[in-house]
Amino acid sequence: MKKYYIGPIIEYDENGNVIYVKIHDGYESWYEYDEKRNCIHAKNSKGKEQWNEYDKNGNRIHTKDSNGYEEWNEYDENGNCIHYKNSDGYEERKRYDENGDMHYI
């Protein structure tokens, strides 16, 4: 018997956000959003989960997954990421010049 792959099954909420995906091998993902349409929680059929927090401008400032891995971001007044760090100890700082070009510090 032949199997034909016709694409994933995707469901959307009333705002057009993807809330469910199932691909041909049975892998599934579910997504939840806040009132600003930011993805605040995602989980999949393999038991992994991720939680996200955002600032008032919709920039992701914190992410944590079900394995305990975390990331933090800080932004300037223009929405540019100026500081990133993660729970593995990696950290980077950046600045942006008057042309908007990024430079590592």
Kindly give the residue locations of the regions a language model identified.
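Alpha-helical scaffold segments
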Residues: 4-5
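A detector of tandem-repeat and repeat-rich interaction/domain scaffolds
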Residues: 8-105
